[in-house]
Amino acid sequence: DFKVAAFHGHAWPNPAVMTADAIIMAHNHPTVMLDTPLGVKITRPAWVRGKPDIERLAAAFLNQDNVRLKEEEEPLSIFEEEYGFECGSPEIIVMPTFNDILGGLPVNSEAPESLLGPLFRKKLVDMDTFDAYMLDGTFMGSIGFLRDRLEGRV
């Protein structure tokens, strides 16, 4: 069975989301900023998806609940002991806004820690390794590639 967990993204989710195969979150309204041949920058809503560092995420959940890890302790083992279930390896999917009136955060031009919510503010997700897709499903590339392209490095 494929398990999906969803949460808004503005606050810490329940640790049980880590048992899902996919975690769907919102709150950031991700967009991708593109540079046109005329030098005009435009932004478009985008889906963002990727795999987090599970050990760092497990350690962060424990830290959030005031469980301090000793240097030799494995975060995944302690996570299972503390919460009573095994931490999976979920993919994170960040939903765009579907309302043209609402703005968004250009994930390829914002500093990753300026994104909203604890998973991003605490740098638990390496956004540059995540992929961006337009609303119609068109694959745009990794956020890191899109950042390099916007900054003229590609």
For each predicted feature, which ranges?
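Extended recognition/assembly regions associated with phosphoester-bond processing machinery
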Residues: 1-154
